C-alpha cells in the first residue's frame, strides 16, 4: 500500500497525504456480514457523556470479522480486498469451499485469488492461521489470541506484527509491536504475516473537516479550561498549567497506570519500550 500527495489546489489539500486505494477491489461489501451501528455521540444509556470529543461523522456499518479462524483444513479463496471504516487495516473477503463466507484482517501481500487455510499441520504462508506452537521460530505473525478460542486480541491494527522468538513446553515467547516480550500459550491461534496498510501512519488529513467526517470533535486543551474543569486550567494570561496532569489529576508524563497485582504480570518478560 502506498500514499499519495495531493496537489495544493485548496488550503485543505496543501498538506494532505491521502491513502492510495488502488490495492482495494471495486466491489460492495458482503451484506450477510454487515451490522448496523447506532451512533451514541459518546453518551451512555442514561444520556450522560462518558467519552469526550466524539460525535457526528459519516454513517458506518460494522463488518463481522472472523478473529478466531477455527475452520480447520477447509480451504478458502480470497474474493476481494476491501476498506473497513471501523479499523485502520484492510479486510479480505474469503469464500470457503463449503460455501461459507467470512471477513478476515488482510495481511500485507495477500491478493485476490490467493488460497488460505487454517489448521495444525499446514505451511506457514501469508494468510494461513495456526496455533503458535506449530510455527517455526522467527515467524512474523499478527492477529494473535491471548486465550485459546477467545479470538485475536493483539497485533490487529494497520502495519503491526509480532515475532515468535522461542518455544518452551506449553508457552511461546513473542516480541509484540510495542517492544514488549510476552509469553503466550502455544495453543493460541495467530495468522502468518504483517497487517496490511502499513503506510497508515503517514496519512495527513489536511483539514479539520476531515476529522469531523471521521466522527472526531475538537479537543479542548486543559490549560484553556477553567480551574473547575481541569487541574491545569485557570491562571492569569497564558499560564503553563504547571506539571502536566490528566483531567482526573494523575501525572500525565510517565506515570505507570498498569495494576501491579494483575495476574498476567508473570507472563511479561520485559516491558514495552518508552
UniProtKB/Swiss-Prot annotation:
Gene Ontology CC, one term: large ribosomal subunit
Segments of this protein annotated with the region Disordered: 223-274
Transmembrane domains' residue ranges: none
Keyword RNA-binding: yes
Keywords tagged on the record: Ribonucleoprotein, Ribosomal protein, RNA-binding, rRNA-binding
Gene Ontology molecular function, alphabetical: rRNA binding; structural constituent of ribosome; transferase activity
Signal sequence residues: none
InterPro entries on file: NA-bd_OB-fold (IPR012340), Rib_uL2_dom2 (IPR014722), Ribosomal_uL2 (IPR002171), Ribosomal_uL2_bac/org-type (IPR005880), Ribosomal_uL2_C (IPR022669), Ribosomal_uL2_CS (IPR022671), Ribosomal_uL2_dom3 (IPR014726), Ribosomal_uL2_RNA-bd_dom (IPR022666)
Coiled coil residues, start to end: none
One example of a Gene Ontology biological process annotation: cytoplasmic translation
Pfam family, one: Ribosomal_L2
UniProt keyword rRNA-binding, yes or no: yes
Description of how the protein assembles with itself and partners: Part of the 50S ribosomal subunit. Forms a bridge to the 30S subunit in the 70S ribosome.
Functional description taken from the UniProt entry: One of the primary rRNA binding proteins. Required for association of the 30S and 50S subunits to form the 70S ribosome, for tRNA binding and peptide bond formation. It has been suggested to have peptidyltransferase activity; this is somewhat controversial. Makes several contacts with the 16S rRNA in the 70S ribosome.
Family per record: Belongs to the universal ribosomal protein uL2 family.
This protein's name: Large ribosomal subunit protein uL2
Taxonomy of the source species: Bacteria, Pseudomonadati, Bacteroidota, Cytophagia, Cytophagales
Gene from which the chain derives: rplB
Amino acid at each position: 500500500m502506498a500514499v499519495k500527495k495531493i496537489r495544493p489546489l485548496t488550503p485543505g489539500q496543501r498538506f494532505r497525504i491521502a491513502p492510495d486505494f488502488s490495492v482495494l477491489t471495486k466491489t460492495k461489501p458482503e451484506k450477510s456480514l454487515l451490522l448496523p451501528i447506532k451512533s451514541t455521540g459518546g453518551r451512555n444509556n442514561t444520556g450522560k457523556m462518558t467519552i469526550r470529543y466524539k460525535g457526528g461523522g459519516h454513517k458506518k456499518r460494522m463488518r463481522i470479522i472472523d478473529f478466531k479462524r477455527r475452520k480447520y483444513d477447509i480451504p478458502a479463496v480470497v474474493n476481494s480486498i476491501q476498506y473497513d471504516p471501523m479499523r485502520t487495516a484492510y479486510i479480505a473477503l474469503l469464500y470457503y469451499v463449503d460455501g461459507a463466507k467470512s471477513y478476515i484482517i488482510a495481511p500485507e501481500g495477500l491478493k485476490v485469488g490467493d488460497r488460505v487455510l487454517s489448521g495444525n499441520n499446514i505451511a506457514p504462508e501469508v494468510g494461513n492461521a495456526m496455533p503458535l506452537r506449530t510455527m517455526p521460530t522467527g515467524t512474523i505473525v499478527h492477529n494473535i489470541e491471548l486465550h485459546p478460542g477467545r479470538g485475536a486480541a493483539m497485533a490487529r491494527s494497520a502495519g503491526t506484527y509480532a515475532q515468535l522468538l522461542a518455544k518452551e513446553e506449553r508457552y511461546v515467547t513473542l516480541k509484540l509491536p510495542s517492544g514488549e516480550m510476552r509469553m503466550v500459550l502455544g495453543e493460541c491461534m495467530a495468522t502468518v504475516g504483517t497487517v496490511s496498510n502499513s503506510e497508515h501512519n503517514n496519512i495527513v488529513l489536511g483539514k479539520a473537516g476531515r476529522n469531523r467526517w471521521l466522527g472526531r470533535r475538537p479537543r479542548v486543551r486543559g490549560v484553556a479550561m477553567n480551574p473547575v474543569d481541569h487541574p491545569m486550567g485557570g491562571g492569569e494570561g497564558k499560564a503553563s498549567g504547571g506539571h502536566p496532569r490528566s483531567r482526573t489529576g494523575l501525572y500525565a508524563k510517565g506515570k505507570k497506570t498498569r495494576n501491579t497485582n494483575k495476574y498476567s504480570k508473570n507472563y511479561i518478560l520485559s516491558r514495552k519500550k518508552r
